[in-house]
Amino acid sequence: MPSVLCSPMDFVTVDGITVVGERINPTGKKRFQQALREGDMNYILEQAVSQSEAGAQVLDVNVGAPGVDEPAVMEQVVKALQSVVSLPLQLDSSHADALERGLRVYNGKPIVNSVNGETEVLERVLPLCKKYGAAVVGLAIDERGIQPSADARFEIAKRVVDAALAHGIPREDIYIDCLTLTASAQQQDVLATVEALARCKTELGVRTILGVSNISFGLPCRPYLNTTFLTMAMYAGLDLAIMNPSSEEMMAAVYAYNVLTNRDKQSGRYIARYADRVPASAALAKALQDKAASGVPAAAEAAGPAVSGPYAPLMKAVEQGLKGEAAACTKALLAEKEPLELVLSLIHI
């Protein structure tokens, strides 16, 4: 059976690679932590809206940070999010009290992220999932910590699945997270995640989920690693990808994969997203070709529009990123012009 998640206004059927927006999470984000402590709900809602516009289908919601009353803030954030976005939510916390406060005010069917292989955690959180009708994420980790081998993680996952089924949670609403370890620190264990994921998919018959971006932490050019790892995981059977929906490389991989695996019927979603898009290199080449045909040298077009007169030094400084020079040029111009006059003149260049 398909797994369906819903909000008061929309629903998501997990029938292909489904994107879970990762940005509502204070981990490693000082500005987000500050927003939580100060109750700056506008900042948090901006993160939700931007992810929705970028193509996220579900939003992960994590409000755990030092100095934050997590249960109270979880309730507040869940209420606020439902007023501005229509996406289903994934309530992300290791505290049962925070999860229940969020579940109590959520109108729809969310995901609870997460339980793990510890008996105490299973007995505390699984009844909440059953009570509120939520899907559940099970982490392949227990009292011993993260195990390096695929076999050990699979055995923990099996224990979590058995416990969830025993609590009356349908198999289609169980998502297993085999845990993404950073390639910079545990390179030798990267493939174990993919192998364990594949076994959970085929042998346990459950859905799978991963925090994809964790793979590249501490390494340069992170989108390259994220996109490659995402593709590996999708081929192994990934269902939910917790990722940054603003990453065009990763989103392109998701949409393309759903086409090539016949999950996006008639390529409808892919066409809707990309039909009107032209690759940047092709667009630039066409623009230069059109200018050349009209008698304008390509080099002149590539260099941008020429600016002469008193504003030329300022424009050049801005284009080159010379802050000190730009400030000096601006100061000189302000000796002769009013601020508004200067701004309006630059706008019309």
Features from the language model and the residues they span:
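Acidic (Asp/Glu)-rich catalytic clusters
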Residues: S52, L103-Y106, R124-G133, A166-I169
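Conserved, mostly hydrophobic/aromatic
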Residues: Q51, G102, I176, A233, ...
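Catalytic alpha/beta core domains of metabolic enzymes, predominantly
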Residues: K131-V278
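Conserved small/polar residues in nucleotide/adenosyl-binding loops
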Residues: I347-I349
